[in-house]
Every structure is written in C-alpha cells, then in structure tokens.
Amino acid sequence: MLLQIASVVPCTEAEGPGKRFALWFQGCPLRCPGCCNPEYLQFQGGRAVALSDVLGQIPPGVEGITLLGGEPFAHAEGAAALARAARERGLSVMVFTGYLREDLEARTDPASAELLACTDILVDGPYDRERPDSARRWIGSTNQRIHFLTPRYRADDPCWQQRNTLEIRVRGREIVVNGFPAIPALGLWKGWTRKSAPIARKTGTQE
C-alpha cells in the first residue's frame, strides 16, 4: 500500500501529547481560508511512500503518531492502515481533520470507520482564521473540537493548557519548521520562506 505524503517529522513535541511521529498527507478537498499548509491541498505532489517504509521511519521512544494534512480522511484507506499498525505497536493515534465527527461517523466506507476506530484523539472542524485559539494547545481555531475517543487521554490533562510551541530544525541548507506559534508570533511565522525537504518540511497543526 502506498501513502501520498507531503511531509514527515519523525519525532516532535509540537503536534500532540508527548513525543510523536507526525505525518502530513498530500491532498485535501477542503479550502479553509488561511490554511497554514496551502501547498498540501492539491492531490498532485508529495511522495508516494510504501506503508512499510513509513512504519520504518517511526523511531523508538515515541508515544504515538499524529496524522494531519492535507486531509487524513481524504486518504482514509492508507491512514487507517497506518493507524492500525501504530496501535498494534502500542502507539497512540491523534488525527486532525477539517470534517466534523458527526459527518465522518455517517460515512459508509469501511476505511473511514476503521480510522475512527483506531483514533485516540480526534480534532475536528474546519480552520477558521477569524477565531484563532490561544487557550488550547495544538488547536488552530476556537470552533474546532477535541474528541477523546478512548480512555488513553483525558480532557483535564494539564498538557492541553500549555502554550503552543514551534520547532525549528536546520538540516543542511534547509530550515524545517513545525508546530504552531503563540498568536503574537503568527505573522512572523507566516512571513517566513520555507523550502521543502525530501520528506520533512514546514507544517502546522491547522486544517
């Protein structure tokens, strides 16, 4: 099975609880104004990577994986296979989607149902640039909701009240940025020029 991938950060603390393997899918049918990853909207682009190769990139010691985009549920079959394999390894799964949970649960395709079944934390709803969220860590706008689909995580965990973080990595002549800055720094972050790396590059948590 091949996954159409825009970006991977093998180990990050800026995309969910604990140290996580973060993967951004290439392609999204939604067009949220102010999307922080407009280069990930087109389904053409990115890299087609075998599921086994993606799993081989997950380093030891991470707590879980986070799936972003693009739109993970536009790649439900591959995303579900990755999430299932991660859960079999004892890893948690966090998914950011621009769709609403209710709409996803109403879908009839088995892949979407399986992806939901393998998800511990679902952040749903389209990003709204007019409603930036500065109170909840990792969440782009106040209309987006956090669903704890398993008992593995809790809403009262202090990690959700901490400040957003931005990670910057220098890889040769490239700067790789991921995460989401505090609101006052957003303009500066948006103004940066970022160059794509082979499978790891700038991304944000908004959908």
Region locations from a protein language model:
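Receiver (REC) domain switch/active-site residues of two-component response regulators
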Residues: 120
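Short secondary-structure boundary segments
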Residues: 97-98, 125-127
